[in-house]
Amino acid sequence: MNVDIQKIREDFPILSRTVYGKPLVYFDNGATTQKPRLVVDALVDEYYSVNANVHRGVHYLSQQATELHEASRETVREFINAHSTNEVVFTRGTTESINLLVSSFGDEFMEEGDEVIVSVMEHHSNIVPWQLLAARKGIAIKVIPMNDKGELLLDEYEKLFSERTKIVSVVHVSNVLGTVNPVKEMIATAHAHGVPCLIDAAQSIPHMKVDVQELDADFLVFSAHKIYGPTGVGVLYGKEEWLDRLPPYQGGGEMIQHVSFEKTTFNELPFRFEAGTPDYIGTTGLAKALDYVNGHGIEQIAAHEHELTTYALQRLKEIPHIRIFGEAAERGAVISFLVGDIHHFDLGTLLDRLGIAVRTGHHCAQPLMQRLGIEGTVRASFAMYNTKSEIDTLVAGIERVSKMF
């Protein structure tokens, strides 16, 4: 990576703190990333100097806040290379984005006996909403299997399509295995069957270039907090020709043009899907986070994280009795593992006492855990500010804990 990692780390104040008297080693980036100072400063500054409700306000502060909010939408559009800001819907996060799409798409286009295709490695947020729709409308959920390396079986995927298949909804990068799924190829396959695709990009957007036009994605979702932005803000991208055909998800202010007791006419895109007061300050934080990523270059970030992941795999494999889950040729900056008979919770707890933050459990992917034949793992996930020396600290910590069992 052709940037100064130490300088990057200085942009993230939390990385200088200690935990139990030890320097913080933060390897829980798959759950949420830390925030650079310029993001936090932007949030504080807007609260102090610009705070006012957006849209329809005639006063100066409201107009200024609206300009910032809509400029943030343009920043997102440019970052993912959408055609228009009409295709960028702000939500509270990936989970709400998926629920919005499932509800609106399901109501408009799916009937009893229709089918959605998902994969075995989905996060619960891309399983449970479809199950709720299945309970309500009687749709069927078909599941793409994977091999023992953690790679989706594309031949089996092809076989799942039928005349009742209405949509494919798959994760781009597994939050457990790190597998980078070939979503461009999978989208092309779906389109050959006349079926649209929803891509869960929560674990890919911080780590690699995501271009919705290059992928030809019909819908794509992600969260701000996974890419150095604030919590409570997410994005639903949808091709305009698809979004224009979907009914609203929620009713309320802003998503309407005219209301009477007899009839309501709905607003134009994207506001039709943004009922109520948006997190207009959070969207500023997201835009600043995307600017920060652009400032360092997503390709350079990806190269650095690939180097880190390769090094981590090499070092972790030196530990006796370690089991690393996922051996896909294309993988992201996530490594899940177990060591001997040590329970994942015990290992994670004892690493925490050494100042090392990892995630333990099923990672909201219980069907995948069932496929792997385990209850949970320890997960280390990396970001642009992590270093090889931190990986050495992790390995030393695991070795120290292992001697206790």
What are these regions (language model features)?
Residues 1-405:
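Pyridoxal 5′-phosphate
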